[in-house]
């Protein structure tokens, strides 16, 4: 299991930013200039049996027991080197040992180094047999990486595995800077286990101690280690001052946990955020349980609620066992509809209208698969909490290709729908869908002829309340049988563009599809899981207008479209444009009176869609799309973006997105589409930028403006300073955080965050721009 990037627990030795490009690489190179490297040939294997070479100005001795060397003494064996003004060499026979024990005492300007560490001090001692080394009242410097300090006594033990410091200190800052350090009465650094143990630890900023712990165990490498991670703090208008102190628990090689006490001043309590990760034979998963024992703000706003406890449970699991079994969980549930408005959480957002709870178990072998699942929804709307869950649902697929010239498939589904309200209709639905295809293709085109039968049976219950309030009545037992016929043809033509762009290739890809589905009146079937599908270019060629099975629209239509692409001499797509339309010979209907455009009796060219992408250069890109629906009498949706991206840290993007109110009303559930905040649709223009503004300084910003409401929708500004041993990030965000139904206006939350990252024990020197961009409520999406 991959461990999160370690940060320095409580004393905070480590890093939490990742970037390997742009200025990050420059900063890493600059930092390594102040770090010594091992510049002698590296000797591999056991070096204890290698000869010892001694150079000095003067030498005298009592052979074979003792020798004294003075004047520029230089002793080498393997990768180890000891230098001093004077060295006394002692050699004694040890009982039971085949080789004599050779030790040295060094005096004056003692310098010891190997491929791991450099030790300096006035006095030293070394065992040439074991490489054990002591240096008194000196300092040390790691070789090839950041890390240095001082100690009353520095010891190398266990073939250089352990560095032991008595009354020592550590910092990853380069020489000449002690911005932060950790000191302790004893520090043991285990290189093999990549851990440092510190007794009586004090974390210092400059000369000032700000934190004490009697014992700390710190991760100093990539191995997973239990301990505190770096704390965080911020201020928001929703919760006022907030402080996080995460603790990482390495439970076992296949599981770990992060426990985070999260203090919120305005809430008057600590939320316990508990994340658990695991890896098993059935797959990998993550669980999160967040719990706030009481919330004084919630108590004031909801005096009639029995409890002010706030909680979230999240579980995600995905895995395969024995190559045939599939297990999937996507489960999110919160204590109340306001949870994501009050608390920032990576498993949900204030813009989410619901949370999903889904479990599924699947079985798959060649030509056959089956899945049993349950799906529920927790709706956050205060206007209508009605929602349907599938409890349970069975999906079965059987494929048999190459039956002569045909491919065949049978799809079956059985599902039971239950509503959260006891007065709403419920149903059991059984669907069977046999399909036969005749695929024909060559190197420049293909045509696929398909026929299928859509047979569905409904057994509906609990209809009295609905039928008493609607003129269109639901039937308890309904059978719906619909044949479907489709012919889909594609061609691909290409030509060299030698005249305009040597080495480039252009394609022309026309496509035409005829679809026929006869009309069946479905007004006696309640809509349990169907909604209008978005008609982008690829969506024009779908079989269905609606998702789900409750509404299958009739079709007698031809869809035509064309795509053109341009590839460079490296076969990289530089440009594409697609445009298409649906021409209806007869009106597309379901018989549902709630679908307003079915009363318009429109035919002809009704739906248009287009998409384009242009990679102008390695740094410039443009992407856009538009969908026009004459049934809605307007542009349904559109989006566009243009981006300049020099590297990971330097980018500027302008974007626009639009959704008409008619489209929202047709696609969203009624309790969302009729809400006040959607009455004018969505029309937002935005800008995102990230750029280093000075040496080691970078800035990130995002701004979105709602042109319908003539007000800001969301904004974010972050500034980060990065150095070799620490980084400081300050951020501000103003984001949409719900809708006030009483006052009929949007509610915003303002947040100011402050974060310190300590660096030096890994290769991470990123400027933090990608992290800040992804943290926005409208996250950055790459156009290139």
Curated annotation (Swiss-Prot):
Induction: Constitutively expressed.
GO terms of biological process kind: Gram-negative-bacterium-type cell outer membrane assembly; lipopolysaccharide transport
Gene3D superfamilies reported for this sequence: Lipopolysaccharide (LPS) transport protein A like domain
Keyword field: Cell outer membrane, Disulfide bond, Membrane, Signal
Disulfide partners: 31-724, 173-725
Coiled-coil region list: none
Residues annotated as signal peptide: 1-24
KO phenotype (gene knockout): Mutations alter the permeability of the outer membrane resulting in increased sensitivity to detergents, antibiotics and dyes. Depletion leads to filamentation followed by membrane rupture and cell lysis.
Domain of life: Bacteria
Note: The correct assembly of LptD depends on the thiol:disulfide interchange proteins DsbA and DsbC, the chaperone proteins SurA and Skp, LptE and the chaperone/protease BepA. Incorrectly folded LptD can be degraded by three different proteases, DegP, BepA and YcaL. These proteases act at distinct points in the outer membrane protein assembly.
Xref: HAMAP family: LPS_assembly_LptD
Free-text comment on this protein's domains from its UniProt entry: Contains an N-terminal soluble domain that is likely periplasmic and interacts with LptA, and a C-terminal transmembrane domain, which is predicted to be a beta-barrel and interacts with LptE. Residues 529-538 play a key role in interaction with LptE.
Record NCBIfam families: PRK03761.1
Protein name: LPS-assembly protein LptD
Annotated organism of origin: Escherichia coli (strain K12)
Lineage: Bacteria, Pseudomonadati, Pseudomonadota, Gammaproteobacteria, Enterobacterales
